[in-house]
Structures are given as structure tokens and as C-alpha cells.
Amino acid sequence: MLEQMGIAAKQASYKLAQLSSREKNRVLEKIADELEAQSEIILNANAQDVADARANGLSEAMLDRLALTPARLKGIADDVRQVCNLADPVGQVIDGGVLDSGLRLERRRVPLGVIGVIYEARPNVTVDVASLCLKTGNAVILRGGKETCRTNAATVAVIQDALKSCGLPAGAVQAIDNPDRALVSEMLRMDKYIDMLIPRGGAGLHKLCREQSTIPVITGGIGVCHIYVDESAEIAEALKVIVNAKTQRPSTCNTVETLLVNKNIADSFLPALSKQMAESGVTLHADAGALAQLQTGPAKVVAVKAEEYDDEFLSLDLNVKIVSDLDDAIAHIREHGTQHSDAILTRDMRNAQRFVNEVDSSAVYVNASTRFTDGGQFGLGAEVAVSTQKLHARGPMGLEALTTYKWIGIGDYTIRA
């Protein structure tokens, strides 16, 4: 089955690479229209997935990721239209010039070819990834979580109908609808057909891909994100940022999971934090330095377990740790962070600069929420993933991250001397 999918994707990629920006946008507009026109089919499939997931004991955080509503589906269709408005990087001349030999040389952006994406129970990813791949002239093979099997099948069927109505092969966007995990291992060895693999999931999936894949892999999406509250932070303003970073949508990878509090501000900061977290329904997992003081406040508090510093809660839970200074905070982030998104709240710009320079994450913030790490927020449109590695892309992966380049030499029957 996968062999045939690979062949179809590779053939489709050749046709996609020849499309103009206008032609690609026409396809995307058709997909957006069809997602809305056939929304009832997709929503019914999603309702079945959600019901099964709830019956199987899936957490509320995961159910939130899985669930579609009419408003969310309309938002997904609107996101596709936003991709139409983005500049197409394919064909862009990055640099070039005329050599001494007279050869005119250009370095030009081109599609990667076929992208493979393995992802969790988030049905919006199916459309986001497909739209970005199509915009950049890439075919894509999708392997979503088993919890979204019906939703993904219905969504991809709509996309393929739109492709065919525009004269393009259905092989441009395909989904593996068999939940058998053995197919993941088979997919990891499809280097004959897949040019880049993006796993979006937990540490176990990333480890499997790094160890078994014969395809170049870009990992990311695990977000153990930190906020360090420096001793000079403005408490009221800091709390607004923390509430946003923790509660706006707890199930996302850019949500803060650990709060590091400078010991010199703890006495005034922790009572205010407890009040705010109680109002927001957040459970605090406190270290010994913060536990006693937080227990006198209104927020629910438990003693933090050492392993929780490495957890991506994806829920209304927040670690709180007292640190001695900036060095202590940076050391903690280096030990427990996932190089996703980390922030400092401070009025001391020297400390801010040190934090920016010394915290080796894909996104580092000064006096801002970690929730900004998102393709849409960065002006990149929808994203394929948030890469936490350094090659070939880092941070939110928009259109440019789905391209490579080729060197093009144009001569007049020019020969090398």
C-alpha cells in the first residue's frame, strides 16, 4: 500500500512543481470552498472520533485538540485562504551574479518534492500541512493519529476532490488511514519517495524517527516551555503574561509549563500568583521553596515531582520553582527545556540580553508570552510544525521551510577554462 502511495506522490510532485502561483492559489481557494461546502460530512466524522476517544478515556486536553466545531472548521478554511495571500517562495532567486567566465549563476528556491508528516490527534494539521505543501509545489503523505482516523479520511477526501476538479492528481495529498503502527516503521524507510519527514508527537515518536528513519527528519513540537520572573519584573504585568501563556489554550505546545521565580521577588510575587491561578483554575506544582507560601493562598497546590519538570502537561497545571538568580534559571532551562519557547519577564535589559543570548531555544521572548510561537502570529501563515532543531529549519515552519534551492547556470555555450 505505501509503495503505491509513494509512487503516486512522487509523480504528483513533478506536476505540482510546474504550477504557477496563480494556479496553486486557485487550488487552495477550491479546497477552502469545499471544506465549507462539505463541512457536515467532516463534522459528523469528527463527532464519531470524539465519541470513541472519550469512551477510550482520552484526556480532556487531548479531546480539545481532537474536537472540531463549525467555527473551528470555518477557521481552518479561512487559514487556507490566508495561505493564498502569502508570497510564494518557489522560483525566488536567493542570490546570484555573473562569474568571470561569463556564466550567469542563480540560486533559486524550488520545492522539496514529497513531504511525509506523522502527527497527533489534531485535525487542523491535516489541512494546514496540505495547504502549505501545495502552495510550495510539494506532494504530501500524511499519517495522523488513530484518534482522528475518520476526520482525516473525510478531510483528505474533500481535498482530493478539489484537486481532481482542478485537473491535479489525488496523489498530491494522501493519508495513511490504517492505524497499524507497523506502517510508521515502513514509512520511515521510504527514502526512495519521501524527501523530508516531519514527526509531530511525543518524545517516543521522535526517538523512533531518529533511530529508524532513512529519510532526513525534522523534529519538533514538544514544548516544555519556561517563563523566568526576574527580580525586577513588574508583578501585575508579569501575571498577565503568565495567565495568557498558561490558560489561553493549555493543550498547545507553546503553553508555559514551568515558572521560574527569582528568590528576591518571591515573597511579593507568590501570593499574587496564587490568587490569579485560583481564578484561572490552574493547579500549581511547587518546589520546596515555594510550597509553604503557596499553600496559604487560594490556588490548588501540590508538591512538584522531579520528573514533572520534564513533562508537557498540556493542561491547567504549572510547575513553580524558586531560583537563586538568572544563572540558576538558565541552568534549569538547559537541563529540562526542549528548545521550543522560553521567556524572561524583567526590567533589567542586561539580564534580558543575557537570557536571549544564553537560552538556546527556537524562540526566546523578553516580556512577552510564549504563546506567540506560531506560524500565524509570526506572519508565516499556517505552519507545518515548530522545529526545535537547527537544521534545516528552526521555529515555526512556514513556506520557506518547505523549499530547498538549486543552482542554475546560464551561459552562451560557456566552457570552463
Swiss-Prot record:
It is found in: Cytoplasm. It comes from the Bacteria. InterPro entries: Ald_DH/histidinol_DH, Ald_DH_C, Ald_DH_N, Aldehyde_DH_dom, G-glutamylP_reductase_CS, Glu-5-SA_DH, GPR_dom. Its EC number is 1.2.1.41. It holds the Pfam family Aldedh. Pathway: Amino-acid biosynthesis; L-proline biosynthesis; L-glutamate 5-semialdehyde from L-glutamate: step 2/2. NCBIfam families: PRK00197.1 (NF001221), proA (TIGR00407). This is Gamma-glutamyl phosphate reductase. It comes from Escherichia coli O17:K52:H18 (strain UMN026 / ExPEC).
